[in-house]
Amino acid sequence: MVKIVLKRIVKILKWIGIVILGLIIVLLIIRCIGKMYYNRTPDGGINETMYVDINGTKQWISIYGQDKDNPVLLYIHGGPFAPTSWADWGVWRKLSADFTVVNWDQRGYGHNYPKYRVTEPITADDMIADGKALTDFLCDYLGKEKITLFGHSMDSIYAANLALDHPEKYDAVIVGALIVDEQESRRRYKEYQLAQTVNDPEMHAAVEQIDPAKEITEQEEIYQQLMANGYATIEDIFAEAETSIVKSIWMNPYCTFGEQYNMIFADTTEYDKMVTGGSIHGEAYGEQLSIANRTQYQVPFYLIQGKNDHNVGTMVEVAVEYYEKVEAPDKDICLVEGGHISPLLCCDQLAAFVHKIDEKQK
């Protein structure tokens, strides 16, 4: 009797294994077909990836557009050093009717890690110099006199500085989840959280301990407490995205499994600390590049921000107040539902905003 039961169990397990193996094979076939389909080059368009020599380093970019004659948009990811190329290609496809979109993994990260990892800290000057060098390369390679910048989160402040310092190189600057001045944003964050925790004595007392003059890393425990107790806006990227995150990851034409693993799961904590000089969040870069008192732009300025972006570094109130002070040949603002990542998650609204910008530039 026992032998009969064991045989049945083995048979069931065997069939379960066959079914699982079959599902894996089907998923891999779907991935292969999807990658091939989305890696096609549009007629009259462009679809390329390459490693560019930038200031003594190799840095990965992808270039995609439906028409080579369209203007060029360079996306500068946030972090710092948090490329989204493992899943963001679907966002840029939505912009590709109006712009040839260049997605850039900055030095030492994304597709560049670990093969082209850096061995010493990256400074704000390095970041700005890389942005200028890549701009010059793209203008030469794609036959343009100028390009448009789109910087998100930490790198919104780099995009703004590049446009402020080198208006001759840019048609416009678009910033999302804008950092204006990190210390001021931390001050406003404290005010916001004091109001949010007024009926929670324990967390209210914790918020009172926040010193806006100190970096997040010096007060990490308080911010973690706030997050653990629900006092932080954390997007559900799978529910809120206006494109399929699963498809964007699984059928990504620009990433292998290994590259996606390195970008999503690899523990780079010690590497990050080395790169940022000990500040894993990299606030020092933002402090050096504050644009609080730099509101005179010689190029059009456009802001897209989540209405509920109460991230400690990108408080929506600070971003909107800065926008109101900006003087530029043209400016516009798009507030979308959601928090810190919503300028990318709400990619249909981003595409409509970018289309509007493109129409103005014609």
List where the protein language model places each region.
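The serine-hydrolase catalytic nucleophile loop
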Residues: P80-W92
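Conserved alpha/beta-hydrolase
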Residues: L95-P114
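Conserved acidic catalytic loop of the alpha/beta-hydrolase fold
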Residues: D126-K146
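A catalytic-pocket lid/entrance helix-loop region that shapes and gates access to the active site
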Residues: D165-E215
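Alpha/beta-hydrolase
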Residues: E202-A292, V299
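Short beta-strand/loop motif that positions the catalytic acidic residue
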Residues: Y297, L303-Q305
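Conserved alpha/beta-hydrolase "acid-adjacent" motif
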Residues: H310-V318
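Catalytic histidine-centered segment of alpha/beta-hydrolase-like enzymes
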Residues: N311, G338-C347
